């Protein structure tokens, strides 16, 4: 998705989705979730128990009787799981219009990490202060973006190698963000601001992150023909900087590398055997969303041969859907091929025109189900959306229900217990959230209650905001934020991470 590279304007933000009405949450006192089937997030087998919540914590698990005046949630026939934790989310600006984060909580997300792909709010402290005043419905963790600090230092002159003094200044900004509570450093090395950076520049900033116990999360430099070189670069950065690595939305996005997920797995597992703490996340769709310029990795957007190769690599202009184009609003919702036919031109002509006129956001259907399956079946790959509030891609509203409904119930790629681990305790541990991600006494009461026979996504490429089915209740910090599909009062927290060493 398009990297946010400028200081976020927190007052005069354009609307993304309409504000949502709320319903009042339950009165003070304990809550009993009765009769449900518990999947605790650890990967352990399910069991039928009751759960008592008092305040923002889980207090008891077992066969429990209601207390006088206690609110009881009937979970019979339902799965009770830890709230889903989205390690890769682009809701930074969406909270301005929809602090209830309806599209997020309705799919069971209780904690999300913003600032991926190299773009983040800055300063982090100012953003956190602003966000607290919005009273978000979900808990929020933040990464500091490499492209954000790079452009703050280099301005518009970013299309070159940074000098030593510029890298030193970037390092100061990364340290500032880590002290203000960032969980790690993110990069978007495929994007315009991050792409000119050398590996050595990123290593220098990652070393600063490592001093604070942070992690390195990367949208790697290439997800097409040079994907394997890009994965090796991420491994090198982790080794030389001495910190954990998270590969964002692991994928093989062009025809030339389709069905090579097994080779990627062998590369990553070799690094893991060598002692590197490297993991990845994956979203459950065969279409990616980004800026149109990534279709031509060489950045030779005025070279017809280079543009044609870029389009051929994703199966042609019919696979490239325009989702946001400020210079040509009439192009939105159409493919390059459709636009070209209407104008009696070629898809190459349309691409070059759009780039000349300022670019666009696109959804490109160019991944294989076989590769997605291979990635999801690795124990070191978690579920993440790469979505966010108002996202013009179905993953923004449907990621977690899609995994549960399509990949667990229908295709049986994963057990329900393993899928929930990939959505809860696994990302929690990656983010250093010690009291979230598991259902056990003393943990924060972030929970989701869903119908395992009905849960499924409904969002599509043409209707990306459709709400999923089957998510009945969502609790954040002990308060009900979703009850039978209605969004209730917000109760999220800002999870400042600080120094984790």
What are these regions (language model features)?
Residues 2-8:
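Sec-dependent signal peptide recognition
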Residues 10-18:
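Hydrophobic h-region of N-terminal signal peptides that target proteins for export
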Residues 19-49, 53-54, 63-64, 105, ...:
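Active-site microenvironment of metallo-dependent hydrolases
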Residues 75-80, 84-89, 96-187, 206, ...:
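Divalent-metal coordination cores built from histidine and acidic residues
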Residues 123, 195-202:
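Active-site-adjacent beta->alpha loops and helix N-cap segments on the catalytic face
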Residues 143-144, 148, 152-164, 168-192, ...:
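Active-site neighborhoods of metal-dependent hydrolases
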